[in-house]
């Protein structure tokens, strides 16, 4: 469902028709109604799907995330870059945060421990770790999060630092 929503390409419809024996050239593009469905969607945007956690409403619930589903919903954020999309998504998840950076009400007693534990707040802990001087490699070692994502989050943090100079 996310791929169809994000691309505008009717994957389920096309897959069903292919299963019935139609070819891609037989199917019409649902948008143009003239060209065939044999095309690759050209996207100039990035989509981030972020689970919405509401663990504070449930008493006694462990905040650590694992294989069991604890999300109460999700947001789908769209932007020209990953940085823009993740910022939009983090603002929409309803945790009272201002995005990746600028969350002064977040209290972290032990950054290393908070980075190691996969919780609903860990992405915001990463921002605090950057502020405390942690490097991308240090955070990667503690979280096991791919460096590509940490580089993008560092871009947001650096941009915030630049804007705060003004």
Residue positions per predicted region:
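ATP-dependent carboxylate activation and anion-phosphoryl transfer catalytic cores
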Residues: 1-166
